[in-house]
Amino acid sequence: MDLQTEIGKTLKQARRAKALSQAALAKLAGVPQSHISKIENTGVDLRLSSLTELARALDLELMLVPRKVVPAARSLIRQAQPTPISLTKPALRDD
């Protein structure tokens, strides 16, 4: 997966985790909703200023990490995130 596609996927996951529509995120970040759609679906090449505003709106931090520590950083991020709830399967109930 190329970097633009990975960024789009990550932003989409973060937006959904915050229960924001594309329109709501666009308003928070000060960019058009159509731009959010393109970023999420086509991996558009973002300007740093747009990426910074989107990260701020989603309460994310942009960071440059040395390549040799990327696997460790990804592992820490996975451990810190709650297990995602499937949007396609109904939740199990205890009643």
Label the model's feature ranges.
Residues 1-6:
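A detector for short, charged/polar N-terminal pre-domain segments
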Residues 19-35:
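Short alpha-helical DNA-recognition segment
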